Amino acid sequence: MSGGTTKAAENAKADLPRLMKALRDQGVTDPQVLKAIETTPRDLFTPDLFKDRSWEDSALPIACGQTISQPYIVGLMTQALTVEPRSRVLEIGTGSGYQTTILSKVSRLVYTIERYRTLMKEAEARFNTLGLTNVITKFGDGGEGWAEQAPFDRIMVTAAAEDDPKRLLSQLKPNGVLVAPVGKGPVQSLRRYAGDGKGGFRVEILCDVRFVPLLAGVAKDQ
């Protein structure tokens, strides 16, 4: 990292208190979630071109045409997932690894799947830099889930499914929770599926969101 880039990141981090206040004002109030966000260096996950915007409450571009999510959405989704310290969490779409890192700080184990090999390798390097020992990665089709490790206490999907993600829901424990953006258009609904213990789910629509689509298969040559 160049000296100029380091300086930009340091200046951007001065915006952290403003970001944390914005999250609280928008309803992200869970102390553990807020602590996880506050102690995670978002600038580690943003490209050099955007280091000076690392602590903005906005989504930013990363490699492979993907994005690192807006901190508010990261906080909202993590809070809605109601993760417990002993939870085993499945994340669909590792991306930069930022959301993965937040989840790793509030759960026991995080299993994360990414369809872009480039993103997976970059995220794994960041996990090593941070010394994370409770993250297990997989290069593969996130829409298929991770049946070998199921059932999970919690599942988070960070790309938009066209309809209810039934295959993923089938990999939840009976009282598990899944949070995912759902919809075919540019604007989707963020939904929370809570297992009722009897094979059914209570579905709550949290808000409108904009996510990249959940694509089948793995990316070629990326």
Curated annotation (Swiss-Prot):
Source organism, top-level taxon: Bacteria
Active site (record annotation): S69
Entry annotated with the keyword Cytoplasm: yes
Cellular component, GO, one term: cytoplasm
Gene Ontology molecular function: protein-L-isoaspartate (D-aspartate) O-methyltransferase activity
Gene Ontology annotations of biological process type: methylation; protein modification process; protein repair
Catalysed reaction equations from the record: [protein]-L-isoaspartate + S-adenosyl-L-methionine = [protein]-L-isoaspartate alpha-methyl ester + S-adenosyl-L-homocysteine
Enzyme Commission number(s): 2.1.1.77
SUPFAM superfamilies (UniProt xref): S-adenosyl-L-methionine-dependent methyltransferases
Record key words, sorted: Cytoplasm, Methyltransferase, S-adenosyl-L-methionine, Transferase
Enzyme class at the top of the EC tree: transferase
Pfam families assigned to the protein according to its UniProt record, in alphabetical order: PCMT (PF01135)
Major site of localization recorded for this protein: cytoplasm
Entry's localization field: Cytoplasm
Entry similarity comment: Belongs to the methyltransferase superfamily. L-isoaspartyl/D-aspartyl protein methyltransferase family.
Role, per record: Catalyzes the methyl esterification of L-isoaspartyl residues in peptides and proteins that result from spontaneous decomposition of normal L-aspartyl and L-asparaginyl residues. It plays a role in the repair and/or degradation of damaged proteins.
Protein name: Protein-L-isoaspartate O-methyltransferase
